[in-house]
Amino acid sequence: MQMHKDLPVQSLFKGCRLTSDGTIKYFNATDWDHYEDGSEVTNSIEDGNDMVELPDAYYTVVVHGDYDWEIRMSLYPLEGYTKFSKKYCSAYEAYRDGSTLYSIRNQVPTVNTNRATFLTQARIYFD
């Protein structure tokens, strides 16, 4: 149970700014107004998207009943666990500027849009 208390996978989540060319700048762990190097973070869509980096890990889903289940995560390839490769997840709800979606703080989220449109607009940034 000690590993559960320490949250080893979740403790490796890192906030960052991800640009369209793939450049990553990590936020200060306790102050997302600044990067790790101490420079100030701007709130501009031209500077990229605010994301959370999810590390390489392993997971399994344990089902206890129809509506009762849990996801177990590990840094190690335990038997029955599936590899989850590093990914980036938006830190904020999607904000649309024109036909492109962004993850930028202090913006009103885009609503009343279907899933297909959201996916198309989210992909535009990295094309």
PLM ranges: what are they?
Residues 41-48, 70-127:
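Short aromatic-cysteine micro-motif
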Residues 37, 67-68:
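Long, low-complexity, polar/charged, intrinsically disordered or flexibly structured peripheral segments
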Residues 1-60, 108-127:
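Conserved hydrophobic ligand-interaction patch in extracellular adhesion modules
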Residues 60-65, 96-100:
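Short, solvent-exposed loop/turn elements at domain surfaces
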